[in-house]
Amino acid sequence: MGYDREVELVRLARQKDLLTTPYAFNTEEAERMADAGADVIVAHMGLTTKGTIGAETAFTLEQSVVRVQEIADAAHGVRNDVIVLCHGGPIAMPEDAQFVLRQTNNVHGFYGASSMERLPVETALTEQVQAFKAIRFDS
């Protein structure tokens, strides 16, 4: 589809008063989406790194703090009413989000995907299977 088309789609959705929550991977994308009227800009740090199928390479949490702040600053440089959320990469657990949110300004929260639906299920399934595997028969 291409990012230009995504920006245009956000612009059209905004004209129809639809809620828009596009990802921005860098400052230029944040500026473009803010200009298009995005309600929420998700500062995306890449594929989630935790879990059984998580990405093997990503930014560190410390690097994510800097990048999320840069994206937030870029978005707010265009429109100060845009909501900015952090997401992805090493920001997978509540404590990860807390780490980023406590060290950034004008970042309003966390946008969950794998961290809300995949990771908790992986944990629960793994624990349940381990419990079944631990069953021992009396001899």
Go through each PLM region and give its residues.
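Alpha-helix-loop-beta-strand connector modules within alpha/beta enzyme cores
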Residues: M1-F25, E56-V84, Q103-T104, Q130-S139
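Active-site rim beta-loop-alpha module in soluble metabolic enzymes
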Residues: A24-V65
